[in-house]
Amino acid sequence: MHPTVHARLHGVTRIYPAGAGGKPVHALGPIDLDLHRGEFFSVVGPSGCGKSTLLDVLGGLAPPDQGSVTFEDRAVAGVVPDGIGIVFQEDASFPWLSVYDNAAFGLRRAGMAAAEIRERVDHALSFMGLAGFAQAYPAQLSGGMRQRLCIARTLVTRPRLLLLDEPFGALDQQTRLLMGDELLKLWRETGATVLLITHALDEAAMLSDRVGVMSARPGVFLDLVQTGWPRERDSNIVSDDAFGHITARLWSTLRSESLKSMGSAQGTTSR
């Protein structure tokens, strides 16, 4: 593997078995993708095209039926590898635990020393703007704050590859923009490689070094769009003329695929 390639999908196919009286669902591929070390890569595509399936396969949550997945030159198979962190759209916080205890939960289960846990959790909560809410409970937080907590809980594991499955999907537009700025700050300061699944073309265009546009099911990449943004960027970039050109290119590819997806007669939807 080339030294700048952090993770690779090669010839990956994923097929879901048939349900009662149905047919197997060819959800993904064959698909090839190289994620470069330290890049921010977003994936857009029509509903049901296999975006989340791609993330599951890359993160070790689901095995490919064909092809191979590697992370840092090691095969990904069966379990989430050390060094990969995953954040989902759903609020995964534990309502009976404080913000601090939510962030510390995984580290405690792993048997980490108390002093190291405190140092990591304090840093993550401070970084995500939650230091003043360490003893609060999730029900006392806004939607955006709860999602920052979920990111903090992943951040304490110090992931080198961060996989995000529509983490801001349930938030309003203003909060999404602010959370996007927080995510860019996190990406710059940690140096992690990031893969983001999103339905929002503007979000993908703003945050990413590259955007992959997927086809209707079975999902493959139809276009890989290089944004050309500087590493130091924030949501103000949406006023740049190039931003409109990028989103227009994404939509020109995605529109016909979305119509195909809407008109599909298949009854089973892959994520």
Give the positions of each predicted feature.
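The feature captures the beta-strand-to-loop junction immediately N-terminal to the Walker
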Residues: 44-46
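Helix-to-loop junction immediately C-terminal to a conserved catalytic motif
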Residues: 59
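Short coil-to-helix segment of the ABC ATPase nucleotide-binding domain corresponding to the Q-loop/switch region
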Residues: 97-105
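Conserved ABC transporter NBD signature motif
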Residues: 67-79
